[in-house]
Amino acid sequence: MKKQALTIIFLLVSLVTGIQAKENDHWYLGTKMGWSDFNILEYRSKDITPFDTKIDTKNPLGAPVFGLFLGYEFNPYFSFEIENDTTGFSPHLIFQKNEQNIQINSLQLATKLSYPITDDFHIYTQLGGMMFWDNLSFKKDLQNIFTEKSRLIPNVSLGAEYIFNKKFITRLDYTWKSNIAKIMNLSMKPVLGDVALSFGWKFGKSNINEIFSSYIPQSSDKQYVALNENINFPFNSTELKPISHDKLQKLQKEIKNIKSKNIFIMLSGHADRIGNKEYNQKLSENRAYSIKNYFTSHGISQDKISIQGMGNEFSLTNQICKDVSDRPLLISCLAPDRRVEIEVLSD
């Protein structure tokens, strides 16, 4: 079991190393710690080679659970995760050869459906399935995976997460697990249940302006503006809001419907007047790169996209906000200035 756990850790680390080389910032890796009401002694006593036949399995017991997970975020609403959990895990005994650990490993695949309350705080649910590694090694269990005798354990999680600095993830969730037989009999009483606190890290390059080099395509005098859109940003941020993803998705479909092959996209980033000029110039450029990053990740060639940072030179709120002195009110008033203007040019 120790070799199995170490093998899983090695595979996850290998995946992270390979993914980082591709400079993709949609991946995340994490660990979780918590408590499961899974009676590991009862599970073992029913095994082919039980640890101890004298164990009293009638008394309900729980066990600590430790897990490692790797996930890919397709967008702020949808992710996919693979997870290995070890129930009964004792970190201080794992490398002690003379100690007999009572523990069991399981593999879980799940989709994660999130709803952003704010840019940093999300609530989510996970829908997936879990199998113990012991069952995965038996051909009969694999053949019965979609029958009433299946060892597959469907699960549902409910939780909340907070993301610090756009990189570090903390989350708390409860996972409800039941077997196929109980679900088919419409029983809602779970076979297993885990409460866990998780910590994760989104990796890949965070400075999106380093991902793409600035390139300004040659434009034709006969070009005209086919489409335009404004995308707004939170204060002092380059992160896209959930509503911005919806607007960009719609714009992307409209771009693909343009019959002309000679299409160029001009992205003009803007900042509000709070802060010094140099900082706002860089912030406006990074916002434009954020939109460029979205378009290129959805199949639009970066050669067709040009960006420019306008700093805080072209405010939309000069007259409206000139007499506002209270900082929170001023931040709210200047919201229209924190934007990227998108112009789609076609011949």
From Swiss-Prot:
| MF terms (GO), sorted A to Z | porin activity
Query: What is the name listed in the Swiss-Prot or TrEMBL entry for this protein?
Result: Outer membrane protein A
Q: Where in the cell is it found?
A: Cell outer membrane
What organism is recorded for this protein?
Buchnera aphidicola subsp. Schizaphis graminum (strain Sg)
Q: For the OmpA-like domain, which residue ranges apply?
A: 220-347
Q: Which family does it belong to?
A: Belongs to the outer membrane OOP (TC 1.B.6) superfamily. OmpA family.
**Sites marked Part of salt bridge gating mechanism:** 81, 171
Cite the residue spans of the region called Hinge-like: 207-218
Q: Which GO terms describe its cellular component?
A: cell outer membrane; pore complex
- Gene name for this UniProt entry: ompA
UniProt keyword list: Cell outer membrane, Disulfide bond, Ion transport, Membrane, Porin, Signal, Transmembrane, Transmembrane beta strand, Transport
Q: Print the domain comment field.
A: The extracellular loops are most variable in sequence, and in some bacteria confer sensitivity to phage and/or colicins.
